[in-house]
A protein has these predicted regions:
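Basic, amphipathic alpha-helical/coil surface patches used to engage anionic, phosphate-bearing ligands
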Residues: 1-293
């Protein structure tokens, strides 16, 4: 019975249809007004062509809506994010161009997440890089998997509206892991967490942190916008502290939670491959990925 529920959740990951039931939440969280939405989309499209600061792959309504939602329908801010998104893709083609999408299952459980998606929390993504063995594949594969995860996630109108939280679990991180985190890699990860992606990041929670990892965070801090600092929370090894920010009902058992609807990115990719449709394949290929049968 529970597996059946999980399969329904996995299949829903490919849903790109607007949900009328989310419109009230979209107004509260994104300042989205159905009566003026089309006007905002037109203004953004006009700004793209008039300013000529970027050449996005798409300018259709559904694509532009992602950027408007994450910037609360303030058109100039949405345009600025779109410019950053296009520049990031242009400067980091190695993260997606010619990348075998299904080959990214190799990262296994270095990323995890819940699929409960409650309106007050959104999607929870968990970074567990301590579970990655640097001798198996380079750190760039983790970044590639993170970028693919973000691109696939923002296809869902639900996640565009609800956004989500990130838990960075440093259990198992050693100096061998830290040695792979160059400034370039740190810059890429920070950009994928919302600086250059149309992702609504509510908060970041660092757990299982110790002073020995100060270098780890110094690398990232350089690239984090000052305005985002208030949304970063350090919990040490205190799960109770984490639970003060995220309801245990939304957390998986390893953090004292009761949410059973969680999975690793390795399984997530396998299920996407099982349930994908022609529209998904076409979009991912247009983004530069190799999508095998």
């Amino acid at each position: 019975m529970y597996q059946c529920f999980l399969d329904i959740a996995f299949e829903a990951e490919l849903n790109t249809k607007e949900d009328p039931e989310l419109m009230e939440i979209a107004y509260e969280q994104c300042k989205e007004n159905v009566a003026t939405r089309a006007t905002a989309i037109t203004e953004l499209r006009t700004m793209i062509f008039e300013r000529g600061e970027c050449q996005p792959l798409r300018t259709d309504d559904e694509f532009l809506l992602r950027f408007l939602r994450v910037r609360n329908f303030t058109v100039p801010r949405a345009h600025k994010l779109l410019v950053r998104y296009c520049k990031f893709r242009e400067d980091h083609k190695h993260l997606y161009q010619g990348v075998d999408l299904w080959g990214l299952t190799k990262v296994k459980d270095a990323y995890e997440g819940t699929m409960l998606d409650r309106p007050d929390v959104g999607r929870i993504s968990i970074f567990r890089f301590g579970r990655w063995d640097p001798s198996e594949f380079p750190v760039e594969e983790l970044v590639r998997a993170g970028m693919a995860m973000a691109e696939i996630g923002v296809r869902q109108p639900k996640l565009q509206i609800l956004g989500g939280c990130v838990i960075v679990d440093l259990e198992g991180i050693t100096l061998r892991h830290v040695a792979t985190l160059t400034p370039a890699v740190a810059y890429q990860i920070v950009n994928l967490m919302g600086v250059s992606m149309p992702c609504r990041l509510r908060s970041v929670h660092i757990i299982n942190y110790s002073w020995i990892l100060n270098t780890f965070f110094y690398l990232f801090k350089r690239f984090i916008p000052a305005a985002a600092y208030d949304n970063i929370h350090f919990h040490g090894n205190d799960v109770k502290s984490l639970q003060q920010h995220i309801d245990p009902e939304c957390l998986p058992p390893q953090y004292g939670g009761t949410c059973r609807c969680h999975t690793s990115i390795g399984i997530w990719f396998k299920k996407l491959r099982q349930y994908r449709d022609e529209e998904f394949d076409r979009e991912m290929k247009n983004l530069g990925y190799i999508v095998k049968e």
